[in-house]
Design a protein with these regions (language model features):
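Hydrophobic transmembrane alpha-helices of multi-pass small-molecule transporters
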Residues: 65-68, 180-184, 210-214, 286-289, ...
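Transmembrane helical elements of multi-pass membrane transporters/channels
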Residues: 21-40, 142, 153, 176, ...
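Short alpha-helical transmembrane segments in multi-pass integral membrane proteins
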Residues: 1-23, 81-148, 190-246, 302-367, ...
Length: 451
């Protein structure tokens, strides 16, 4: 039985309605994912303790460093599929879908091997405190055993979003989130499995979401239907996908590596700092919900409209998406600024842990609009086929500048707040660069020669 075709042609109709109708399911899906990630940390922090919380809550930067490059590759696949879908070239859509999945299988196996074998080395390089190291190694190794499922889900989700279907991934995230929370309570709360239970619960939930996404694609009646026997490489399309995806992957890796350097400096302040900053990172994740929602909407919208030659419509959509993302991110930032003490106590009641999380919130929260602007322009440029521009901007501002600032500033002001200021400073500088390029460059006609 064929699944309901929920793809959306974003080249017609009200720009505002198309953008919001796409972004809202992405927002809700990411909200579910962020909630279960947060509940993961809350359960570990309450049932196991602050050392375990430090291991789990501070995991985001390392996980993103290991997975970010691969996720970027599948952003490239989504861009290519969106462009062909907008141009009504459905034969290319079919070929790109099967190339995407063949690539995902290879990347998933590679990431699993890298995560399992290199986790101890990376955690040692990150100067993880001795009282947290063994727990962190156990958590990460178990987590990375689910890498194949994570990659396959992201590949499938990217395909669905590229053709305008943001609702199906929402349903799958709701289901997997419920599975994760239930298993957390069972494994960590009832069975006392500690961080191992949290990791196993996460892996199982990732497998559930991947299976649901694959079933959806194999039962679709649209041009993006997945046929298992047709999975294989179309080399010209693989080259096109990687030409779009590698810059996005490198951009993710740049951000992740810089953040791992930040985390390694935080680790030198001890497990209280790790737990406090880890708690903050979980709360900060809610800020990324509107940003990510409009980033996904912008990438699909710009890709489809430029693929269809709707250049003025693409410009209007870019403005609407970026402004909405900035407004929502800043609203959440203001709320976090005032509610930080209450938010941090959800994870752990230790006064030292709470104080560090609150301090980071008060330094960074009011600058979230700059973060949203940078990600919004990046999404527009990727959708327009100019993924190299955000890659180089992030390399200069979010990697080289951020790491240089921390390295030099800590020698003058050896305080953890010095580290926290790295983010607002580098977000602001990148915004200036992006604004100049966005206003001056003719990014909107980048695809005319390739489609």
């Amino acid at each position: 039985m064929a699944a309901i075709n929920r793809s959306t042609d974003m080249t017609t109709g009200s720009i505002w309605k198309r953008m919001v109708s796409f972004a809202v399911p992405v927002f809700l899906g990411n909200l579910c994912q962020q909630l279960y990630n947060t509940v993961d940390s809350v359960i570990v922090g309450k049932f196991v303790g602050k050392q375990a919380l430090a291991a789990v809550a501070s995991s985001g930067n390392l996980i993103f460093m290991m997975t970010g490059f691969f996720m970027g590759l599948f952003i490239g696949a989504g861009i290519v599929i969106a462009q062909y879908f907008g141009a009504k070239n459905y034969e290319k859509v079919r070929a790109a879908v099967h190339t995407d999945f063949a690539f995902a299988l290879c990347c998933g196996v590679l990431l699993t091997l890298l995560g399992v074998f290199f986790t101890p080395t990376i955690l040692t390089w990150m100067r993880t405190p001795a009282d947290v190291l063994d727990t962190s190694i156990l958590y990460f190794r178990l987590y990375f055993l689910g890498s194949l499922a994570t990659i396959l889900y992201n590949a499938g989700m990217g395909i669905l979003q590229a053709v305008g279907d943001s609702r199906s991934p929402l349903y799958y995230l709701v289901i997997s989130s419920a599975v994760n929370v239930a298993l957390d309570l069972l494994f960590v709360g009832a069975m006392d499995m500690g961080v191992a239970g949290a990791a196993v619960a996460t892996v199982i939930s990732q497998v559930v979401s991947a299976v649901l996404c694959i079933i959806k694609l194999t039962r679709s009646d649209g041009p993006y239907r997945l046929e298992i026997k047709r999975i294989g490489f179309d080399l010209p399309l693989l080259k096109k996908i990687t030409s779009q995806g590698v810059p996005s992957g490198v951009q993710n890796s740049i951000i992740a590596i810089a953040n791992v350097v930040v985390q390694s400096n935080i680790n030198t302040f001890g497990s209280d700092a790790m737990a406090g900053c880890g708690s903050y990172s979980k709360v900060e994740g809610f800020v990324f919900l509107p940003i990510t929602a409009f980033v996904m909407a912008l990438t699909a919208f710009i890709g489809q409209d430029l693929g269809a030659g709707q250049f003025d419509r693409a410009k209007q959509g870019a403005r609407i998406g970026i402004l909405c993302s900035m407004a929502m991110a800043e609203l959440i930032g203001v709320a976090l600024f005032f509610l930080a003490p209450y938010a941090m106590r959800l994870f752990n009641d230790d006064p030292a842990v709470v104080a560090i999380g609150v301090r980071q919130s008060h330094i960074e929260a009011l600058f979230f609009c700059f973060l949203a602007f940078a990600h919004g322009v990046s999404a527009v440029l990727r959708g327009a086929g100019r993924a190299q521009v955000p890659m180089y901007t992030m390399l200069g501002c979010w990697c080289i500048l951020r790491v240089s600032y921390i390295t030099l500033a800590l020698k003058v002001w050896p305080d953890i707040a010095t580290i926290f200021w790295a983010y607002p400073i580098t977000w602001s500088v990148s915004c200036v660069v992006f604004l100049l390029y966005y206003l001056k460059a003719d990014w909107v006609h980048a695809l005319e020669k390739s489609l």
